[in-house]
Amino acid sequence: AFYICSKITKNNSNIRPHIIYSLPFTSVIDQNYEVLKEIVENNINKEISSEDLMKFHSVVPIEYENFEGYDARFCFENWQSKIISTTFVQLLNTIFKIGKNSIVNRFHRLANSVIILDEVQAIDDKYYKIISEFISIMARQYNCYIILVTATMPMLLDTIDLIEDKEKYFRKLNRINIINNSESEITLDEFEDIVLEDILENKDKSFLIVLNTVKSSKNIYKYLKENTDRDIIYLSTEIYPKLRLEKINKIKNRNKKYVVVSTQLIEAGVDIDMDIVYRDFSTLDSINQTAGRANRNGVGGKGIVKLYKIVDNDRRICNYIYPRYLLNATEEVLDGKYIIEEKDIYDCNKEYFLKVKNRLSNDTSDELLDLIPKLQFKKFRDKFELIENDEFRRVDIIVNADNITSSIIQQLENDNEIDNIDLKNKFRILRQYTVSVSRKEMSEI
């Protein structure tokens, strides 16, 4: 991205391109921000300020160096920094929801920019067509350079590969083996026994067990806690963001061999390195992302990824989460393959995405595209939701976990004269301590 920016400036000294680095989730941005900060400081040879690099998402307090109040809010919401680290939701809302609130004030910052979408496979495939159309327009009309980054690139977007003969590099990879045990189904109880036996036999190995639902992940976490003295860490969306980040940083300690039980949140951009990985059956791109947590750094022998198909009440748990056509495509690709070496994953991905492309429905994208010539922009904005809004089915709970939350809650309860910016910042901080639960779960608390 720095190289492309320098080329743009060299060709036209009047243009000062921005870099917009987007990731799927706020938690991933928070994990990667310090690394990004170090890279930027090394590139510009000085300590950075808000003018150089800014983190922008719903949990970040509104701050901008040398400015206060509404001036800080203006610089923050208008993306005045040279490098913006943000989420897919914020980036794509800036493109698709122009005309709404403060978004209109930052749309112009996209022109002449280098836009990076990291872990692009995390985007819902029903939006692939319209996103492809719009980023093509951004490239042609607004002089944007779009970089899509993923180890499992969907062949559903028209792109130019920056690496020639990329297959050659994939075929040299030899860090992991995927052991496919998904030809038959097993119960969660049977899966628990298999995992426990492996953990007891390999006390010098770290383990990652990834389940498809919070319920199944909590069940196996409880079972392992009761039956082994290993240090077990649990991760899911039921853990508030600040604590999740602390747990992930703890897992990164290579001097200790943890057992980690998690939902799929571990997949995209979470930089941990485990020896043995277990995965409940899912779509191939999701399996590959989980496999990326095994022997990530290529040290300590070959990593093992063990794939199982778990059932609950005679129904596959994966069917609760993933579209049937994606699971079918995965089953067809893996059929007859017991051991899949890392060098063979590229061909599996290629076959998988060809199958997906032939079965993918573009109805949602087509409906959105049809609204544009009709000038139905409000309906267009309202219909595009990268993350489905289920506020009527879920409730946010603030966990009063430490002195920070206690102090903020006390101020909100007692101070009626908090200015608007300060109020926004306090709620942004509280989002780091917020979990979302279903209304049914809420009634049981």
Describe the predicted segments one by one.
Residues 139, 193-200, 204, 210, ...:
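C-terminal helicase lobe and adjacent C-terminal extensions/tails of nucleic-acid helicase motors
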Residues 42-97:
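Inter-Walker segment of RecA-like/P-loop motor cores
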Residues 15-41, 57-60, 155, 214:
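Conserved Walker A/P-loop ATP-binding site and its immediately adjacent core
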Residues 94, 259-274, 289-297:
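SF2 helicase motor core recognition
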Residues 53-67, 211-215, 232-248, 262-267:
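Conserved helicase motor
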Residues 89-93, 103-138:
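SF2 helicase catalytic motif II
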Residues 1-14, 35:
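Walker A/P-loop NTP-binding motif
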Residues 145, 149-201:
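Interdomain hinge/linker at the junction between the two RecA-like core domains of SF2 helicases
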